[in-house]
Amino acid sequence: MAQEIEKKFLVKGDFKAEAFKATRITQGYLSSVPERTVRVRVKGEKGFITIKGIGNASGAARFEWEKEIPVEEVQQLLEICEPGVIDKTRYLVKNTDGKHTWEVDEFYGDNDGLTVAEVELADENEPFDKPAWLGDEVTGDPKYFNSMLMKNPYKNWK
């Protein structure tokens, strides 16, 4: 079991030329209460189940447990998930500091037009370079949690 520490930002510029990998992701939630989310996901050719706990005060750190499971099982579990499926492409972009990799998620469907970037850190105060294409920080803002995007998608914000 591990603690995940990450910072999340909106994306305001073009990042795709810097991406070295792109993977399609489809995911649903068996539980989306903030205290404990249970997610199933198909990421490329692999399946996963993930449990996340409530975040700390800043929203940057929280418990995360993940296990690979067969894609067929994910497909079956998606049928009993809460309404709303998240569909996105995740791009990986090496940071200019050479130490970090940005995960940039471009959303589709009801969340079309939303793009966010996350960077995982060893601790909340670890320094990292911010690429020019980053926008405002949204770390800890619940409306940008994937589990909330399925309930209140981006298309409803306008």
Where do the PLM segments sit?
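Phosphate-end processing signature that detects enzymes handling 5′-triphosphorylated RNA
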Residues: 1-158
